[in-house]
């Protein structure tokens, strides 16, 4: 109960900021597409939600989003853990290393997507690997790599904070007992850094679940990689189906909540959080 007292101010602010837009989206989702105040606007109840549940396009977009989430989180955790271990071994990270790690994440998502698009279409990556026409799979890989490039830095810093929780005396005892590097990592380092791993996993998974900029810019736009957030954007702003787009945004919000709950439960089962 004491922990909730510390969380209460942040929860109140979060609810105050999100209550109006979420409520407005729910209200909009109950009507047909014309703009509010239009004479052609009609109440349709849950028809938009029924259309989403029965839409193959929607569930294909959700599946694509989940594939991206799994790939991005796995790669970011692996690279981030390797970088964090290297920085911990060096000692105090160099300022230039911190800058290079956080620079992609510090950019606006749309800016980093533009940088990555130029790299894989007309820049160094296109010249090195001959990326003239990468196809659907190549577009998916390009989108994933762009997000990995943007998010690995913050993942590294989260994991580095977790690695600093490892007691040097405990590592020295493991070395004295003859433990190998892999045994020390598995038996000593990872259990101590487990809370940081949990935070990084949930944070990066939810961030990956809202991926939009990559499919719009790298894939020109959404030609082969159609994620659920992209479908919401395309339905709302390109097709101007406001009611259906609002319903999609609510369903996407619920799916993100389910994803977070599942991840937290899995981490609790493994006694990580």
Residue map of PLM features:
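A structural signal for multi-pass alpha-helical bundles of membrane permease subunits
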Residues: 3-273
């Amino acid at each position: 109960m004491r922990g909730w007292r510390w969380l209460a101010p942040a929860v109140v602010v979060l609810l105050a900021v999100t209550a109006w837009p979420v409520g407005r989206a729910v209200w909009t989702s109950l009507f047909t597409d014309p703009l509010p105040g239009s004479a052609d606007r009609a109440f349709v109840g849950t028809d938009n939600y029924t259309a989403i549940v029965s839409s193959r396009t929607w569930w294909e977009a959700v599946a694509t989003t989940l594939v991206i989430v799994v790939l991005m989180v796995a790669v970011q955790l692996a690279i981030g853990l390797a970088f964090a271990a290297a920085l911990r071994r060096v000692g105090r990270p160099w300022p230039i290393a911190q800058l290079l790690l956080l620079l992609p994440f510090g950019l606006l998502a749309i800016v980093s997507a533009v940088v990555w698009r130029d790299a894989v279409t007309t820049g160094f990556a296109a010249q090195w690997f001959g990326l003239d026409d990468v196809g659907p799979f190549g577009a998916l890989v390009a989108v994933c790599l762009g997000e990995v490039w943007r998010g690995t830095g913050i993942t590294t810093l989260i994991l580095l904070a977790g690695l600093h929780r490892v007691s040097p005396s405990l590592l020295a005892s493991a070395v004295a007992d003859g433990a190998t590097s892999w045994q020390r990592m598995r038996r000593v380092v990872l259990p101590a850094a487990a809370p940081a791993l949990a935070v990084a996993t949930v944070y990066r998974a939810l961030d990956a679940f809202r991926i939009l900029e990559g499919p719009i810019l790298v894939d020109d736009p959404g030609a082969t990689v159609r994620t659920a957030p992209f479908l919401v954007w395309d339905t709302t702003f390109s097709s101007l189906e406001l009611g259906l787009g609002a319903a999609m945004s609510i369903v996407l919000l619920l799916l993100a909540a389910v994803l977070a709950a599942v991840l937290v439960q899995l981490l609790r089962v493994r006694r990580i959080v």
